Curated annotation (Swiss-Prot):
One GO CC term, this protein: periplasmic space
Cofactor note: Binds 1 heme b (iron(II)-protoporphyrin IX) group per subunit.
Entry function: May transfer electrons to the iron-sulfur centers of ClrB.
Practical application: Has potential use in bioremediation of waste sites contaminated with chlorate, such as pulp and paper industry wastewater.
Protein name per UniProt: Chlorate reductase subunit gamma
Protein's organism: Ideonella dechloratans
Subunit structure comment from the entry: Heterotrimer of alpha, beta and gamma subunits.
UniProt xrefs under SMART domains: EB_dh
Compartments, as annotated in UniProt: Periplasm
Single Gene Ontology MF annotation: heme binding
Residues the entry annotates as binding heme b: H74, M138
InterPro entries cross-referenced by the UniProt entry: Cyt-c552/DMSO_Rdtase_haem-bd, DMSO_Rdtase_II_haem_b-bd_su
Keywords: Electron transport, Heme, Iron, Metal-binding, Periplasm, Signal, Transport
Length: 239
């Protein structure tokens, strides 16, 4: 009984936060029209898309995505995120989805040697049910999201979340990443098979569209956990 009450309360809180954040996003971003929130996926028969500097990325459409500071999920971790935009691309090849992200970051934060040091990072997010009605703010107790999280220390995490503070690592050997440090910042590719087991995340096989969200962390700016730059609304992968 207590568990059910807690779940309902979390859902209500999540909906309230979503309403507030969506309104703020619309005002701050000038409400990017839904028709413009499209990431077009380039489908190729083969080839190597795993590297951020692979030739295929010169052919894939590039979309500029605006980011905003995420709603503070924890009152002790607050601030203004540094990253304001990133360039997103996507390729479907050899039964995998490859997502390439590129953004400006003046300093490379790749290690944490002390408690006041934090890593650069980036992530993409999908609603497991494939529905835009899912909250883009880490989901809710009923609607789970799947996050692919790249960290600048070389780790790549496959996560499931049911709301703020609920991110849970889910073992998988199929999520991969590659990164390149450029003179301007980072270029990162995250990839995973289109089809995975239900308990491992979002199934992308056979879909014509899929909601997707983005996030970036600037370690130099003390960003970690919920302090990050994010998309406040779902964008759409269009296969």
């Amino acid at each position: 009984m207590k568990t059910n009450i807690l779940v309902k309360r979390m859902a209500v809180i999540g909906l309230a936060v979503a309403a507030a954040c969506t309104g703020a996003a619309a005002a701050a971003q000038g409400a990017v029209p839904q028709a413009q929130r499209i990431i077009r996926v380039l489908s190729v028969a083969g080839g190597d898309a795993a590297s951020p500097q692979a030739a295929v990325w010169k052919k894939a459409p590039t979309t500029q995505v605006t980011l905003l500071t995420a709603f503070p999920g924890h009152i002790s971790i607050v601030g203004t995120a540094a990253t304001q935009k990133l360039a997103a691309q996507a390729v479907r090849a050899s039964g995998r989805l490859f997502v390439r992200l590129a953004w400006s970051d003046r300093t490379a934060n790749t290690v944490m040697k002390d408690t006041d040091q934090f890593l650069d990072g980036a992530a993409v997010e999908f609603p497991v049910n494939g529905k835009v009605a899912t909250l883009p703010f880490m989901g809710d107790p009923v609607n789970v999201v799947n996050v692919w999280h790249w960290r600048a220390d070389g780790r790549t995490l496959n996560l499931l979340a049911k709301g703020f503070g609920t991110s849970t690592p889910v073992p998988t050997e199929d999520l991969r990443s590659a990164s390149v440090r450029t003179g301007d910042g980072w270029e990162v590719v995250l990839s995973r098979p289109l089809r995975v087991k239900a308990e491992e995340g979002a199934n992308l096989q056979g879909r014509r569209t899929m909601p997707i969200g983005f996030a970036a962390w600037d370690g130099e700016n003390q960003e970690r956990d919920g302090l990050k730059a994010v998309t406040m609304e779902w964008w759409q992968l269009r296969f």
